[in-house]
Structure formats: structure tokens, C-alpha cells
């Protein structure tokens, strides 16, 4: 994947955990705003090796780590849809669930018919069953680092998401914590962009300085 915008002479490749430092406050603010309001035809471009633009729905943006709700309706909708797809790929499990749902439905229908009121009912789908069971992410994060790791784990699970963007996360993480996150990102083959307003320790990073020159630091 690649990133491009007007101040760059050429696109920046996004591989694993990429750190991009924007030293000019106005530029940093503007790029964060572009990410927040991202559209396929916006000035900020994310695209793959085939020059295909990354869709808004394929990007996960985290501007407030502590305030990020891993059980928001948007996240849960994606998780439930992925679970449904998993069941569809396992015919034996899906068949077993369908039989159990049919049995439960028959019992409820019988009671509806016995009731004096003229009751209606609908068949329940696997997706509706997942929702009714209240399937959600169990959160156990006590620190900002643990919350970041939790977000990465959720992002890994969401197959329709292609890019995760952390904004100014380095301000809350130690060098060892950033290293641990980078290791996890590398091992799980994720694509993550860290947007930072200042240099992030001595990790490999791209730095767009206040004169708008792009510098690479600590690159192997």
C-alpha cells in the first residue's frame, strides 16, 4: 500500500508499521483532518500496488486511544458479519445451528398458535442469532499500550479493513511499548500507519520537516 499527498515528491510505501512524522503543526493538523474526512477522491491518497484507491470503509482511524470503543455498533456489525461468513464456510456447523434454530422456532410458533391473540413471527437468521446473543469483544485493557494491542487484534480480525491509522499514539507509549507493537504488526502482517507530530524515538521513520523536505531516518 502507498500514501501520497501534495507535499510529497513521491508516494510513501506503507509496509507493516510505518511511522510518518509531520513536524509542521498545520500540516499535521491538515493530514489528520484529511484522514478523518477521507474519501476516494480527496487530496490525500491511499492506494495499492495496482494503483487502486483504498475505500473509506477499508480504513480504521484511531485518534483517541482511550476513547476508542471496541464494541461500537460499527465494529460489532463487522465482527458479526465475519462470524456469519465463518459459519457459512463450515457446512456441518451451519447445518447444526439451522436445525437447532428450526426446533426453537417450532416451539415458539406452537405457542403463538395457542395464544388467543393473532400473533405473527419471522424466521431468525444466523446473523440475527449472533446479535441476540450479545456477541461482543471482551475488553481487559488497563493501560494505553494494552488498549493499542487490543485495537490491533480487532483490526487483524476485521478482514474488510486494509489500513489502521494511529494518530499521535507515540505521546503515550514508551520505546519498549512501541517496539512490542511493531513486533506484533510484523508477525501478523498488518498495515498500520503511525501519524506523529514529532520524531518517535529511534525507530525507522519518514519525517516531513518544517521546510517540507521528506527525510528518512534509521532505515535499514
Curated annotation (Swiss-Prot):
Keywords: Antiviral defense, Calcium, DNA-binding, Metal-binding. Binds up to 2 Ca(2+) per subunit. The keyword Nucleus does not apply. InterPro entries: CRISPR-assoc_prot_Csn2-typ (IPR010146), Csn2_sf (IPR038600). The keyword Metal-binding applies. GO terms for molecular function: DNA binding; metal ion binding. It holds the Pfam family Cas_Csn2. Ca(2+) 2 binds at residues 118, 138, 142, 150. It comes from the Bacteria. CRISPR (clustered regularly interspaced short palindromic repeat), is an adaptive immune system that provides protection against mobile genetic elements (viruses, transposable elements and conjugative plasmids). CRISPR clusters contain sequences complementary to antecedent mobile elements and target invading nucleic acids. CRISPR clusters are transcribed and processed into CRISPR RNA (crRNA). Binds dsDNA, binding is disrupted by EGTA. Belongs to the CRISPR-associated Csn2 protein family. This is CRISPR-associated protein Csn2. It comes from Streptococcus pyogenes serotype M1.
